[in-house]
Amino acid sequence: RRQRQMCIRDRGIRLKASLVVVSGEVRDSHDLACHIAYGASAVWPYLALERVRQLSISSKDTNLTPEEAQENYRKALDKGLLKIMSKMGICTISSYRGSELFEVIGLNRDIVDNIFKFTKTRTEGVGFKFLNDKLKIYGDIEDVESGVGGFYKHKKGAETHVTSPKTVLKLQKAVRSGDFDDWDEYMSTLENRDDVQLRDLFTLPASIKHNREFNEDELKEIFQKFTVSSMSLGALSEEAHQALAQAMNEIGGKSGSGEGGEDPARYGTERNSKIKQIASGRFGVTPDYLASAEEFQIKMAQGSKPGEGGQLPGFKVDSHIAKLRHTVEGVTLISPPPHHDIYSIEDLAQLIYDLKTFNPDCPVSVKLVSEPGVGTIAVGVAKAGADIITIAGSDGGTGASPWVSIKHAGSPW
């Protein structure tokens, strides 16, 4: 499909022809976005549409006709595609088509240079031979009924998940018992899991051995460099939010409040978050909130959902959260993707200046996300006067991130 797009483009007839993809592999909005971004004029996901039709007939929980169900599926794909486009500031399909606004992870340079010529890649991976062998295996498999693949929800014997039921059970056991052996068993499960993320592929040479014991002063100095990613009260429960703050304060590190404010009763105690975040919605940002900080953090983007704003569903906005965010209970709270008072480096410099005027001794960090070219953005942020630049990776997420972003958006570093 990609080669056909390149062929007609190189011949100068791309604008005179349409590419319609008929595929049984397209399932969700990410699949659709990939096809459009690599040149498809239209996509017909025939297998997904047929599956939706069958579900509407067999399901006892819906009164939708097959046509209505298929139309709902089409609308969901369109809405998801618009969401993906909006992350990059694009509002029309014609501007997104052929843009190749993706990053390749897991394919070698030979494939990228031949097929995804204008797409960024920073890793090596599998090649044509591996893909060809896989296709041969799939072609030889006879028709069998396949179960749910386990891509989103963990299934035994299916795709590996970082937070598997086994891992969660061991964590719960360690927390409830307070036994260090149980905690050690939980950590061992994490460290010896199957390779799921790129960092799981990194290993230290066997010749390197660390037998040196650190004294308490050296450990304290190391712990001061540790921070916990900012996650808001609402995305996390009050108990989890306070536990993270207290744990980091006890070892001398820092935790982030996230967007949404913090209970004033925690200020000046061991439950206070040292890093206070200022995000696009400005929820919970008050003079007292800022005065309790040891570091200000301006959130320009979030690692697990770059280009998206925050959204806290109304059912999560109880009386306590509504009070902290100075809003109404039960109302969905939406933070826009951009800061509406920041449209240039000069605007960012003004906010940094205002924060430093409020507390000259408090460093200001700016949170960006990992992406190709982030270095250029970081230079501008440094020129704006930021003391610290935080680069959030793709797994810097919370319960407030949608599935499509968790699975497909952001880079590991």
Regions found by a protein language model. Give the residues of each.
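Gly-rich Lys/Arg/Thr-decorated short loops/hinges at beta-loop-alpha junctions or inter-strand turns
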Residues: 1, 14, 223-228, 306, ...
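Flexible glycine/proline-rich, aromatic-decorated loop/lid segments
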Residues: 2, 30, 34-64, 71-72, ...
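Short, small-residue-biased leader/transition segments that mark boundaries at the very start
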Residues: 3-8
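Active-site beta-loop-alpha junctions enriched in small/polar residues
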Residues: 22-26, 48, 260-262, 301-303, ...
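Catalytic cores of alpha/beta
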Residues: 26-38, 372-384
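Flexible, glycine-rich loop/tail regions that form catalytic "lids" or insertion modules at the edges
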Residues: 32, 44-47, 57-284, 293-306
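Conserved, mostly hydrophobic/aromatic
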Residues: 35, 92, 248, 348, ...
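Active-site-facing alpha/beta catalytic cores
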Residues: 236-354, 358-365, 370-381
